[in-house]
């Protein structure tokens, strides 16, 4: 088994960008373990973590502001290679004796793509061209670099776009290598990891499994864990991972809240209970949930009600068990980011994060909270799970409640349940189920006039949401062939009662989120 202490790590200190985890993700793609850490981490804590490299992320702060996010200066003296990105470059510049000012005073702020001109050879830019496209997003500027640093690159509006201190192995870049808009961003991060930090690149999903099993066993000991199965990929992967770690100490509670997809309850019991032998208790709490949701149309209230009631159902079931101390969840890193961190604004309270009451009776276990969705699928495959589970469509904890706009009724739920089943059937039949990241239907709550046969109708409008993405942090709408969309539309209108109109959501993320609520 791989010992956590033996795994090479590059840590990313969080200074507030919504896309900070992309840095860690890119590094993991190179076969190097990486994770986000608070910018408040101390030098002693960094020594204990023992990383081979440190990245200071971007962020919205200004280093000259009174409430600027700071760094323990001793971290810069540990002899560990450091890469400062955007705000991270400005921070290390200010800490080491350079000067940062509002860009308008001496230069220009930059937002968008720009051309980087390299002025010196550098390990950081090895095998990249002298001129390359990068994404800038800064309002402040470095006007004086610290002693011992040299200029490596500049742009037309940024005189210090890349700097380095070779002796101390400290590098600063004013642009964002983690985003796709930076042409050689991956190469730059790879150079930092391998050329500067001397990474081996020997971390894999098998290593992650070993590490998580060790962490789970250390945290749980001989105590018992409850896992809520939602029917989605995430909780299913957590279940198999936990069983591998602690065996019969795990009890899975499958709460049927009346908000599941068509046939989902029976599929969960058959696949995870039958094929994988998980101990699953099925609880029919549909009336309990739907009664509480009656008359509620605010999406945040719906999420909170479902999150709270879900835990109360667990409390009821846990009271029948003995020695249960932990609640496991399939929280992903995208869930955590969308719910906000100490440096990032909350986008929406997430079903696995923000809906839990403060007096919850369990400690949390969230083994997937550093992974993106595609990494969870890779993990599931590494655990020996079949494609029908691993490639199952993502499903939020609140279920169809957040795919019904406005008040939830049995009639609305049925329109989503049946239309979603048709959508999934036709996407699979067209061979698109591996190409489209996520797809589902939404009852918009809007009624419109239609004609069916010789009669006038006034029924619901169903929206189809289908996206393509790499990691779920950003997404674009899927270009489904028109003939496939037409077939889906015709089937839904003809086979699903109380629906007379279909629309297709062509909004990217951002500005929209994947789910409608």
Swiss-Prot record:
UniProt catalytic activity: XMP + L-glutamine + ATP + H2O = GMP + L-glutamate + AMP + diphosphate + 2 H(+)
Record carries keyword ATP-binding: yes
GO molecular function annotations of the record: ATP binding; GMP synthase activity
EC annotation from Swiss-Prot or TrEMBL: 6.3.5.2
PROSITE patterns linked: GATASE_TYPE_1 (PS51273), GMPS_ATP_PPASE (PS51553)
The keyword ATP-binding appears for this protein: yes
Bilayer-crossing regions: none
Cellular component GO terms held in the UniProt record: cytosol
Keywords per UniProt: ATP-binding, Glutamine amidotransferase, GMP biosynthesis, Ligase, Nucleotide-binding, Purine biosynthesis
Binding-site residues for ATP, renumbered to this chain: 230-236
Function comment: Catalyzes the synthesis of GMP from XMP.
Annotated HAMAP family: GMP_synthase (MF_00344)
Complex formation: Homodimer.
Protein name, UniProt field: GMP synthase [glutamine-hydrolyzing]
Species in which this protein is naturally found: Streptococcus mutans serotype c (strain ATCC 700610 / UA159)
